[in-house]
UniProtKB/Swiss-Prot annotation:
EC number: 2.3.1.199
Protein name in UniProt: 3-ketoacyl-CoA synthase 7
Entry annotation: catalytic residues: 183, 262, 345, 349, 382
Lineage summary: Eukaryota, Viridiplantae, Streptophyta, Embryophyta, Tracheophyta
Recorded family membership: Belongs to the thiolase-like superfamily. Chalcone/stilbene synthases family.
Enzyme class: transferase
InterPro entries linked: 3-ktacl-CoA_syn (IPR012392), ACP_syn_III_C (IPR013747), FAE1_typ3_polyketide_synth (IPR013601), Thiolase-like (IPR016039)
Amino acid sequence: MESSFHFINEALLITQTFITFHQFLVASACVLIAVFGYYFFKPRCIIYLIDFSCYQPPDFLRAPVSNFIEHLTISGVFDQESLDLQQKILERSGISDDASVPATVHEIPPNASISAAREETHEILFAIVQDLFSKHEIDPKSIDILVSNCSLFCPSPSITSMIINKFGMRSDIKSFSLSGMGCSAGILSVNLVKDLMKIHGDSLALVLSMEAVSPNGYRGKCKSMLIANTIFRMGGAAILLSNRKQDSHKAKYKLQHIIRTHVGSDTESYESVMQQVDEEGKVGVALSKQLVRVASKALKINVVQLGPRVLPYSEQLKYIISFIQRKWGMHKEIYTPNFKKAFEHFCIHAGGRAIIEGVEKHLKLDKEDVEASRSTLYRYGNTSSSSLWYELQYLEAKGRMKMGDKVWQIGFGSGFKANSAVWKCISEIDSRGRNAWSDRIHLYPVCGDTSSALKTELLS
């Protein structure tokens, strides 16, 4: 009898164990389904570009080549050889007499003090931020995230603190001031906002992108460090971003991709753009002879990462086939994909004519594809990280940006970095809207200046 009860007890225990294990399997399956469902079907963080503003210097800050050289001569800082080199670079730079420098640089000798740099920063950023706020009736206290990038001017209090103080922003605003990131830092700032918005929903962000010219003039004799004196000009951009659903109807663009490439592990790339001290103890930014080659290498790596995300399968297949054929010795060159099948517009950092022409050649683009970049270099000079936004405004002012179009921004910067941002136009762009090109867009492109080839001999 006891043996019978013992058998029943064991049977009940086994049944109980079976049910518990079965429930465990069901629960585990539910958890896995929930996890996969969350990652595959969760709402994506969509980044909207509501609008942006670019600084347009007043005409009295123009720096014609003749005046530029005259001021350098009168200053008594440079010997004749250095003056001749800078004049040669200026005349071949592709920069027009309309490009501007701050009032403090017009002084003789130029004022390179911290107060001069602050004055320049205030002049540029206060104007473009106020323009954005006024145009869209934005309360400064509604800004949740504030990011600035200025490579060589890193004051304390920071640049974002200047803006917070000027416009009376909230005490809990998330602010970041990036420095030392070079001319590609504008895209880096957008990427930082993108990452922050993954965590902070329903946020409004303001990105400020510029370089201060006033404190960074070089006063020595080193050829590689004199180039920066001639190509950098006054400029800046303010970009208003949002991940709020209610802003989708008024946004101009939607962010599609950001690809960042850093080749700083290679010494030649790392040293291609570097702030340093010359033999006489004078500080400047040296640009190496290998700069175009370094930029090309970084761009190739960046393109390899971007290509599969944007190119049609037909172009990807052509690339793969040519790659295999080259491995087997059947072809010498690998097929360059036609990126015009992925993008309607291209904005290449206006760092110099050699850089623009290098990208044009590498990607096999047409003259019209790089028109915005050349025109920006011609009209505004190298405005560092903000140049990409002047180019985008150029396309808008020309009436070329249509709903559904995609634009590829390509930035290069010290480190060495190559960064890409892809935007999709999601609204009708009014070409008559006021921007940094409105008063003279009918004059562009400038024949003979923006399309002629530049021999890369400035450093030879």
